[in-house]
A protein has these predicted regions:
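An extracytoplasmic/periplasmic, membrane-proximal ligand-sensing/linker region
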Residues: 174, 178-180, 184-185, 195-215, ...
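Extracytoplasmic small-molecule ligand-binding "clamshell" domains
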Residues: 43-76, 241-243
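Acidic, polar ligand-binding/catalytic clefts
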Residues: 81-117, 199
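Bilobed "Venus flytrap"/periplasmic-binding protein-like clamshell domains
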Residues: 27-55, 59-60, 119-185, 301, ...
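Short, low-complexity disordered leader/linker segments with a strong preference
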Residues: 1-30
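Extracytoplasmic
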Residues: 27, 56-58, 68, 78, ...
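Ligand-binding clefts/hinges and TM-proximal coupling segments of bilobed small-molecule sensing domains
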Residues: 140-157, 228-300
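Pocket-lining segment of extracytoplasmic ligand-binding domains
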Residues: 88-90, 98-101, 129, 166-255
Length: 317
């Protein structure tokens, strides 16, 4: 009987040692909050999650659907996710407890890992309207987005930076899909939309109506960025909608976490993100935009110490 107990104890200890030795350390299982299942955040988030899981030892990342940036901030705060996609203006509002996040209180524990790609503010007009500049909006019918939406906030800030106000034109509060229909029907001359490129509704509009992309550049862009530093300059290329290229401004999609996440884990996430671009591109076209040249762009909150460590190694901090 004693011999049986001794053998059982040895067997149990062996199992325990095997379990501990399996990967050399604990597995870090991380939930990544993204966006709706039809959106860019979820699609690209799934690619990033796969690359991080395959390339980093003892890290497993799972992309989860969510309601987008505001929801993701709350998920990080409530520890329902460890990393998340967020638009950089919402990240700023979340950390400071202002604007769209004022009812949630300041989430000072949130911090950035990296800027990923721009979400461009797109001002599109029908060619027949004759609109070529923001000043040309005066007296026209202009859709600024749903009232209180991100696009509408961006539109109001840009109009103010141009020294204008909504009283200068006939303002319409419509989603861009609704605005697209109205532009085809000739009841709206121009519309604002903030999204990743290309915007499917604009692509569809361009199939039915001759359009122009109106530049948001020069002093207007400079004034805007001086007041709202989470904006960044970008270009809508000719290849996007098949029309003349235009300079504009953009929010940045930012990979975000909290200060609680292990520094070495975040270091490895950051390193892997920027040193496996081929894998990112293979999974999603936005992988081309994940570069060290724009890693810090548009971020107005603190970066996680693990990300800072990597950026200092690469000489960009």
């Amino acid at each position: 009987m004693r011999k049986f107990i001794a053998i059982a104890l040895v067997f149990t200890m062996a199992l325990g040692l095997t379990a501990c030795a399996g990967g050399g350390s604990d597995i870090h299982r991380l939930n990544m909050a993204t966006g709706g299942d039809a959106g860019t955040y979820y699609a690209f988030g799934g690619v990033i999650a796969s690359v991080l899981t395959n390339k980093i030892e003892n890290v497993e990342v799972t992309a989860q659907t969510s309601g987008g940036s505001i929801d993701n901030a709350r998920k990080l705060k409530n520890k329902e996710a460890e990393i998340a996609f967020m638009q950089n203006d919402v990240l700023q509002y979340a950390v400071t407890g202002t604007e769209s996040m004022k009812d949630d209180g300041a989430m000072e524990n949130l911090c950035a890992i990296a800027s990923l790609y721009p979400e461009a503010v797109q001002l599109v007009a029908t060619k027949s309207s004759g609109i070529k500049t923001i000043a040309d909006l005066k007296g026209k019918k202009v859709c600024v987005g749903d009232q209180g939406s991100g696009s509408e906030v961006n539109a109001s800030q840009i109009i103010a930076a141009a020294g204008m106000s909504y009283s200068d034109f006939d303002v319409q509060y419509l989603s861009f899909s609704e605005a697209s229909t109205a532009m085809q029907n000739g009841t709206v001359d121009a519309a604002f939309a903030t999204s990743a490129l290309p915007n499917s509704a604009i692509t569809e509009l361009a199939n039915y109506t001759d359009i122009v992309v109106v530049p948001i550049d020069g002093d207007i862009a400079d004034n805007l960025i001086a007041q709202y530093p989470f904006y960044a300059k970008t270009t809508i290329g000719t290849d996007v909608y098949g029309v003349e290229a235009a300079e504009t401004v953009a929010m940045m999609a930012v990979l975000t976490t909290t200060a609680d996440l292990d520094e070495e884990v975040v270091y490895n996430i950051t390193k892997t993100l920027f040193e496996n671009q081929t894998d990112l591109i293979a999974g999603n076209a936005h992988g081309r935009e994940v570069t060290l040249d724009t890693a810090l762009q548009g971020v107005t909150v603190d970066f996680h110490p693990g990300a800072v460590k990597y950026y200092k190694e690469k000489g960009i901090m």
